[in-house]
C-alpha cells in the first residue's frame, strides 16, 4: 500500500536520484550534478508550496516518487538560479552540448508564436517516479487533487515539453487541458469544482 509523506532535507538525496533517472537528458536538470539537484529542491522545502513523497508503506520508507506543487514556484526557481549562478555556469561549461541545445531552443522559441494566457496561481513544478515503481504517478496526482479540493483551489497549471508525450498523456488522463504554447512547452490547466 502506498503512503504519502512530507519531504524534508533528509530525503533530498533520494529525490535527486529519482529526478536524475526520470528526467530526459534534453531537459537541463536531467543532466545536472546530484548536489545541484539537491540545492534546487532545497528551495521548495518551505513557503507556500507542497513537497510530497510516496513510499511503499509506513514501515518501508524507501522513496518511490515525489511531487512539488503550490504557489510562488517561479520565484523560487529564479532564486535558485541567482544563488547558484557560478555552479550553473561551471555546469554549462562542462556540458557544452546541453548549453548549445538550450541556446538553440531559446533562439527557436524567440521566433515562435507565443499564446497569451493567464497562468494559474498554483502550479506543479515536478512529478517524478522511480523507475519500475507502479501506480506512483496517479497516487501523487490524487494527493494533489485531495489537497486542492480541501483547500478550495479552483485551478492548477503546469508546463510540459511538447516532446514529452508520456507526460502529456498522463496529464490528459488526469483532467488537464492545453491552454497555451510557450517556448516549446504546452501550458496545461486543470479546473477544480
Language-model region placement:
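A short beta-loop-alpha structural element at the N-terminal edge
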Residues: 1-17, 71
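Conserved beta-hairpin
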Residues: 49-67, 83
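Conserved beta-strand-loop-alpha-helix junction that forms the acyl-donor binding cleft
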Residues: 117, 125-132, 158-168, 184-191
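Conserved GNAT acetyl-CoA-binding A-motif
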Residues: 118-123, 141, 148-161
